[in-house]
């Protein structure tokens, strides 16, 4: 499921003038996946809190939640075409409202250890490279189909990311230096024999 979605998104990005390398593809796919994952996670946490009779405070304001700007749904559970931004409206929203809002988390966070600070740090370092709101809408719809509930789904996603980073290295592009072959990882673990509670300096 994830593999086909990644291929579909790469096809969309291939048509984008602002995306020319595997690194661009990975970066653009990453910020979209991150926001979708965060929205799903917050939805689960809110549901758990509700079941316990507790309240939950969302990290992301309602107006900037995935389910509002990226994939608003109608009563039938399908994309609400009347409320889904597209074209220039979508690009303007992402560049002028969403990214500045997310970047602002860095200043609003109480400490660097918080998720809020990390969100701000991430979005201070990247740029939306989509120039066509129609292409971005296509990518959003592909990503919205993904679910991150099971360990198997999360495991599949991690393997696909690893493959993308490996491909950047093979193509002599930036990012390949972040790929460590699994055989080397296993060898390092066998030599170091880390134990729970130990720290590496």
Question: Can you annotate each of these PLM segments?
Answer:
Residues 1-196:
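Non-catalytic, mostly N-terminal accessory regions of nucleic-acid modification and defense proteins
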């Amino acid at each position: 499921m994830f593999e086909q979605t990644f291929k579909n998104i790469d096809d969309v990005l291939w048509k984008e003038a602002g995306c020319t390398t595997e690194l661009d593809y990975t970066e653009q796919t990453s910020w979209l996946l991150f926001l979708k994952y965060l929205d799903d996670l917050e939805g689960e946490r809110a549901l758990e809190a509700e079941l316990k009779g507790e309240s939950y405070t969302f990290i992301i304001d309602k107006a900037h939640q995935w389910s509002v700007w990226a994939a608003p749904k109608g009563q039938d559970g399908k994309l609400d075409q009347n409320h889904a931004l597209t074209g220039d409206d979508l690009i303007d929203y992402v560049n002028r409202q969403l990214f500045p809002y997310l970047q602002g988390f860095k200043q609003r966070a109480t400490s660097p250890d918080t998720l809020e600070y990390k969100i701000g740090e991430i979005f201070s370092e990247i740029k939306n490279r989509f120039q066509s709101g129609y292409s971005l809408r296509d990518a959003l719809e592909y990503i919205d189909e993904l679910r991150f509930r099971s360990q198997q789904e999360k495991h599949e996603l991690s393997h696909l990311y690893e493959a993308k980073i490996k491909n950047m290295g093979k193509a002599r592009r930036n990012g390949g230096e972040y790929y460590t072959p699994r055989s080397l990882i296993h060898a390092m673990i066998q030599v170091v024999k880390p134990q729970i509670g130990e720290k590496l300096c």
